């Protein structure tokens, strides 16, 4: 959305079909959608919500047919979702109206294109440009675009570190500089040790980058929470999101990560693994074609959501069409497959995905915890692991599973 624009939506044409649900042997009311609930919530505490007033009206009901919902600024680009609700329901007549064709126009009134383009130019990053072009439907029609030039485009990479890691960081800084990044290292004894000090430093680097540099594309935090506090931890899961959100809308404006090392030895291990991946120096890279997909024991959710998520990944991404072999464990069989899963992980997998319950020290069922991780023999075959579960990356609680 261009800056300062008022969005006007005009419905140009629509085609719909009305269906009598009795013709399809549907004689009961369609249940209303329920609000989201936490997986940790007891089923006994969940109330079924039903609006008797709406269900008593003899009219077709739907939320706005087409709605624009603003999300915020993503690296100075204001973005929004177009939400389409193509089904209307009349509970009294037991009919639904389905819109199968919608043609509409969005117009941006009083748009300041120059201001929008200047903001984009100030924060241009080839690493965000590909995100914008593939994720924002009207991006190319609003902004001037160009091909990324990874040779000429300066990419700013900021490292925030505790000074105790200065020597251990050198190989990583040298490697990133060799790749072409402009690396700036700020030690907390210089900029301050509090979350506020760090956020203020990063905010200034983004708003007023020095020496004609662009706004940073990457921020790397080096140190565990004992050395560098998380940007957010009060009342919820620990997070560094605030360090990379400069417009207070929960959208990251830089790509942010953390080496949560407690000492230089930990950091050296993390750096060595990272550089090995980026230089493609594995002794046997054949493991990169193997993935491990696990829908764990989560009885009330696993049959639909756990298995569904794993099957979705396999159907669209992790399959022979992409030269990937997926070792898949669906619920309920996954519950008795713990030993087999650990064995496959030790053999090497590029990607491991688990969805079910978790805790700070690991995945719950089938169990895969810190003890298992510390005993692994997959040297040189390190996976990217994704846990769709609670607490496994709570990096403010000793050595959590994500850190181990």
Residue ranges and their predicted role:
Residues 157-185, 252-340:
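A domain-level signal for caspase-like cysteine endopeptidase catalytic cores
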Residues 242-277, 355-404:
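Catalytic cores of nucleophile-dependent amide-cleaving enzymes
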Residues 201-242:
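Hydrophobic or amphipathic alpha-helical targeting/insertion segments
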Residues 181-216, 315-351:
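Functional beta-strand-loop-alpha-helix junction segments that form "active/interaction loops"
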Residues 1-188, 197-218:
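Extracellular pro-sequences of secreted precursors
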Residues 167-169, 192-196, 227-233, 300-307, ...:
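Extracytoplasmic/secreted cell-surface and envelope-processing proteins
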Residues 85-87, 160-164, 186-191, 221-225, ...:
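Active-site-proximal beta-strand/loop segments in catalytic clefts of secreted hydrolases
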Residues 75, 150-153, 210-215, 248, ...:
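Extracellular/periplasmic catalytic domains that process cell-envelope and extracellular macromolecules
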């Amino acid at each position: 959305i261009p800056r300062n624009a008022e969005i006007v939506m005009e419905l140009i044409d629509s085609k719909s079909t009305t269906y009598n649900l009795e013709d399809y042997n549907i004689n009961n009311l369609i249940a209303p959608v329920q609000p989201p609930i936490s997986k940790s919530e007891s089923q006994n505490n969940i109330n079924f919500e039903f609006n008797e007033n709406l269900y008593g009206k003899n009219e077709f009901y739907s939320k706005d047919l087409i709605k624009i919902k603003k999300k915020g600024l993503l690296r100075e680009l204001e973005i929004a979702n177009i939400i389409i609700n193509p089904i209307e329901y009349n509970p009294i007549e037991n009919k639904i109206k389905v819109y199968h064709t919608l043609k509409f126009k969005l117009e941006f009134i009083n748009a300041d294109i120059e201001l929008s383009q200047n903001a984009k130019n100030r924060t241009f990053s080839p690493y965000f440009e590909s995100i914008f072009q593939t994720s924002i439907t009207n991006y190319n029609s609003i902004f001037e675009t160009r091909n990324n030039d990874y040779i000429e485009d300066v990419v700013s990479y900021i490292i925030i570190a505790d000074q105790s890691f200065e020597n251990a960081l050198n190989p990583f800084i040298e490697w990133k500089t060799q790749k072409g990044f402009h690396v700036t290292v700020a030690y907390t004894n210089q900029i301050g040790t509090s979350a506020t000090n760090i956020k203020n430093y990063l905010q200034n680097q983004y708003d007023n980058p020095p020496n004609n540099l662009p706004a940073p594309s990457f921020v790397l935090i080096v140190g565990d929470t004992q050395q560098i506090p998380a940007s957010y931890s009060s009342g919820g899961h620990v997070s560094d999101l605030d360090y990379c959100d400069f417009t207070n809308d929960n959208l990251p404006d830089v790509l942010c990560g953390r080496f949560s090392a407690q000492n230089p030895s930990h950091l050296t291990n993390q750096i060595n693994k990272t550089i090995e991946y980026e230089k493609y120096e594995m002794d046997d890279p054949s493991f990169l074609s193997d993935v491990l997909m696990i829908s764990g024991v989560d009885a009330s959710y696993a049959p639909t959501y756990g298995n569904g998520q794993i099957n979705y990944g396999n159907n669209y991404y992790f399959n022979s069409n992409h030269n990937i072999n997926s070792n898949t464990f669906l619920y309920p069989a996954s519950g008795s497959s713990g030993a087999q899963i650990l064995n496959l992980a030790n053999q090497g997998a590029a990607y491991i995905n688990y969805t079910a319950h978790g805790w700070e020290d690991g995945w719950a069922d089938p169990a895969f915890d810190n003890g298992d991780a510390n005993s692994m023999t997959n040297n040189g075959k390190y996976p990217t692991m994704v846990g769709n579960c609670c607490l496994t990356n709570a990096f403010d609680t000793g050595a959590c599973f994500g850190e181990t």
